[in-house]
UniProtKB/Swiss-Prot annotation:
Keywords: Amino-acid transport, Glycoprotein, Lysosome, Membrane, Repeat, Transmembrane, Transmembrane helix, Transport. One of its GO terms (molecular function) is basic amino acid transmembrane transporter activity. It is a multi-pass membrane protein. It comes from Homo sapiens. May play a role in the export from lysosomes of cysteamine-cysteine mixed disulfide (MxD), the product formed upon treatment by cysteamine of patients with cystinosis, a disease characterized by the accumulation of cystine in the lysosomes. The keyword Glycoprotein applies. One of its GO terms (cellular component) is intracellular membrane-bounded organelle. This is Lysosomal amino acid transporter 1 homolog. Glycans are attached at N10. The gene is SLC66A1. The di-leucine motif mediates lysosomal localization. It comes from the Eukaryota. Amino acid transporter that specifically mediates the pH-dependent export of the cationic amino acids arginine, histidine and lysine from lysosomes.
Length: 291
């Protein structure tokens, strides 16, 4: 889910004990062990998010029923949140690492949507034009919105050092938000809501099917791990100089909700995997039992 925005301060403002490579590579001033742990957990969470989609691609190839296993609204909610994340990366003028990560998320979502439509319409090609047109229209709207939002105000906020699965991060200081920061905060909140709502259709789909076949649990397990590590990285980070812990948490609340809030819903999906897997195993063994 998103990374906090970190200041692009001169190295003179960083204590001499800070780790040089963290500053050089990420632009992050790690002042103590808490900051170093925050950076480490953040980087690991990026790897978790990057690896989460590959098991689902493999599962889709093996089972061929991805269109039945995954909810379309789940995928649309996910790509909507990631698209807000990508737009936010331009608004916040983030480091290349964040921008590349955000682009990867959207590309991975597009691949997953492509697989979904492929398996759904491979036997009914005549019905394929409508959803493709809808997706293309959505992408065109996103492409048009990006330059408009980028020109909404001056880039007054410093760059971010790194970012997780999806939300725009906003500098939380004592000074008032600029107009562009307010826009970024709103986009981050929308992205958070989209991530929360996206799980509900998938939970409903699993419940109606009474099965999770065709879904790779690694997809949700790695996302849960990534969101947990991201949330911890936010909580471990020291507030900016002169900023209280309460103010820090308040300014990062939407992104904490977007990362840690979805854990409850992902836990429900995990329980569905456990329950329906046992039900499937029991139904397969039942004909073998003596009458």
């Amino acid at each position: 889910m998103v990374w906090k925005k970190l200041g692009s301060r001169n190295f003179s403002s960083c204590p001499s004990g800070s780790i040089q490579w963290i500053w050089d590579v990420l632009g992050e001033c790690a002042q103590d062990g808490w900051d170093e742990a925050s950076v480490g957990l953040g980087l690991i969470s990026i790897l978790c998010f990057a690896a989460s989609t590959f098991p689902q691609f493999i599962k889709a190839y093996k089972t061929g029923n991805m269109d039945q296993a995954l909810s379309l609204w789940f995928l649309l909610g996910w790509i909507g949140g990631d698209s807000c994340n990508l737009i936010g990366s331009f608004l916040a003028d983030q480091l290349p690492l964040q921008t590349y990560t955000a682009v990867y998320y959207v590309l991975a979502d597009l691949v997953m949507l492509t697989l979904y439509f492929y398996y759904k319409f491979r036997t009914r090609p005549s019905l394929l034009s409508a959803p493709i047109n809808s997706v293309l229209l959505f992408l065109m709207g996103m492409a048009c919105a990006t330059p408009l939002l980028s020109a909404a105000g001056p880039v007054a906020a410093p760059r971010e050092a790194f970012r997780g699965r999806a939300l725009l991060s906003v500098e939380s200081g004592s000074k008032p938000f600029t107009r562009q920061e307010v826009i970024g905060f709103v986009i981050g909140s929308i992205s958070s809501v989209l991530y929360l709502l996206s799980r509900l259709p998938q939970i409903r789909t699993n419940f109606l099917r009474k099965s999770t076949q065709g879904i790779s649990y690694s997809l949700f397990a790695l996302v849960m791990l990534g969101n947990t590590l991201y949330g911890l990285s936010v909580l471990l980070k020291n507030p900016e100089e002169g900023q209280s812990e309460g103010s820090y948490l308040l300014h990062h609340l939407p992104w904490l909700v977007g990362s840690l809030g979805v854990l409850l819903l992902d836990t429900i999906i995990s329980i569905q995997f456990l329950v329906y897997r046992r039900s499937t195993a029991a139904s397969e063994l039942e004909p073998l039992l003596p009458s």
